[in-house]
From Swiss-Prot:
Coiled coil: none annotated. Belongs to the UPF0128 family. Disulfide bonds: none annotated. This is UPF0128 protein PF1488. InterPro entries: UPF0128 (IPR005266). It holds the Pfam family UPF0128.
Length: 222
């Protein structure tokens, strides 16, 4: 993609951490419990439907007891997450902050959780076109099946320009950061021929509503 491309770039700051809702945690595949760990009051998670209220179990040498499975994030608490890179591998760390107390919840491979979320939400564009996941995530899509050269922006049809406006709005209003590189080769047999490379902050993709919006934009020219 060295020539004839259109670029939309917002060189903002990739967020170091982000707040999430219960609907996001559910989409990641987790239940949030209030109970005890080794007799001490704590919040912790288990896979959706795996544990029940009143259950006591052992995990990695510690005893857990579930008093209550939360339906919402407690009013005085915040669910936060961040991406860390260790030995060349990304991890999603998420925790609950309740006033001055921090309850670590899990540290998982973000690729596994994103796949779980995207499959649950049937976000096939994201599943098909993701290329790399780290602090940022790269998507690449190529639908070019003709021998041609990229067209200048002035020759883009209205539908293509509408997609570019959507991307600008996402970068400006939601992400604050993003890089979208686009080549358009024209339309043949009612099929748009184009290539795109889209880089976005990974944390935002764990938000159910944002993930749905990105998936929608990736499929607008299909």
């Amino acid at each position: 993609m060295l020539e004839g491309y259109y670029i939309i770039e917002n060189p903002g700051v990739v967020p170091s951490e982000r707040r999430f809702r219960m609907k996001d945690l559910k989409a990641w595949g987790y239940d949030l419990h209030l109970g005890t760990i080794e007799g001490e009051r704590a919040y912790f998670v288990s896979r959706t439907g795996e544990r029940e209220e009143g259950e006591t179990y052992s995990l990695q040498g510690k005893t857990y007891h579930i008093e209550k499975t939360e339906k919402e994030i407690p009013e005085n608490a915040r669910l936060l997450a961040r991406i860390v890179i260790e030995r060349g591998q990304p991890y999603l760390e998420f925790w609950l902050e309740e006033e001055d107390t921090v309850y670590p919840l899990a540290k998982e491979d973000p690729r596994i959780i994103l796949k779980r979320l995207w499959e649950k939400e049937k976000l096939n564009q994201l599943l098909k076109h993701v290329r790399a996941v780290g602090l940022t995530t790269d998507f690449y899509k190529d639908t070019v099946f003709i021998k041609s050269i990229p067209l200048p922006y002035e020759e883009y049809p209205p539908k293509v320009r509408r997609v570019l406006r959507e991307v600008r709005d996402i970068h400006r209003d939601i992400m604050g950061f993003g890089r979208f590189v686009f080549q358009y080769f024209g339309e043949e047999n009612k099929t748009h021929n184009y290539r795109l490379h889209w880089t976005l902050p990974t944390l935002h993709l764990f938000d159910v509503e944002i993930a749905n919006e990105i998936d929608k934009v990736l499929g607008m020219l299909d």
